């Protein structure tokens, strides 16, 4: 193994997402200098299969780094460290000589549904949840490996290590098989110890497969040098320190502002899905009786982020605007979704608040947070003849606010301040709705690539650019948080009452959704 280099003024953060793999260059103060991206590819198959080529993923990573080097002359010599994060969950198996054992089952793969149902009903599932803080679902490596062990045990028989996406890239960058404390503890371990837990492994029925679980390393404390083979593939210099980041949700939360500044702040990413996070001391974690959500370690001693995710966020807005676009279009003058997005706030402001109740379960996968029901579906309640399209638009936006509140309620109290990221944060209507829904001021993070930044922050601490993560947060995160926007008191009061109806209706509709699903 080559020796570690100790020079340079750039840190590269790699974020291998489900849609795009990005390599982003930052200076030591957290300023984004340049980025390069490669579109990610995965294959959808029968029975809920969604797979991704391990070899292609590494090739895409190497290409992104080479493309970044083409944009930044002298990048190899200037790079002080590299850090990698990526899409969470999923199962990336490697065998002899670190060769892939088939394609990865990524987090979108739903083949383990029957195994999840069986394990969730088992006598040890609550103990598993109490240790991991994480609800069991088809996304997770534990459920997927348990399913493989039932239907295709030869996959596990031929494997020597079960990795996640970022772990696979780290193996290719450094030659080291490892995983990080976040994915290790929410999948197979205990968020209090950040180590594997025998009870969890037994609850999943994977005692005989424990040998596949790799070493746990913390990339903010230890690094490995870039291998000669990886250097040749990426155009970087052998020996450059490489940090294994935490899972992408944790890195995005860190980069976007889940920690720092106002105590008790929450961080919500409003994209196709909604991801809602609270950083808390381990002792303050509230585990709900439904057994949903995630508890994910952060690269700060004793601090974790509690997470609830709702399946459908901006896809609800896309849906209602696409309905309008379809109605407005003619062969001579087509109207697109993009044409209508600028009108969202105007329609919202032309309507009455709280006139209609909307549940934003528009995803065909149903809902996963703060409750799990694959049959959950969207719907309007309270329509009258006086309602027009602006009322529908407003109710959809308000439904996202209610879903956000529902997720934070499952984690305990409302946040003292809400930091929001994602393209939808540009909408004043959405910002005001989220603020009133949780009755807290909102601030928008200007950080463009929060996941890559979070990973790079770990490398910055590891190489000694900052004495501790709190010091890095003060320079990389807090200056990028926008002005505080206070909630409208009248709307906050109205939404307090609306949420009661929202939740009561959500609970009452569950058997209706199930009956609709059984009739299809």
UniProtKB/Swiss-Prot annotation:
Pfam families noted in UniProt: FGGY_C, FGGY_N
Signal peptide: none
Catalytic reactions on record: erythritol + ATP = D-erythritol 1-phosphate + ADP + H(+)
Enzyme class: transferase
Induction: Induced by erythritol and repressed by EryD.
One record GO biological process: carbohydrate metabolic process
Keyword check for Hydrolase: no
GO molecular function: ATP binding; erythritol kinase activity
Similarity field: Belongs to the FGGY kinase family.
Main function: Catalyzes the phosphorylation of erythritol to D-erythritol-1-phosphate.
Protein name: Erythritol kinase
Gene: eryA
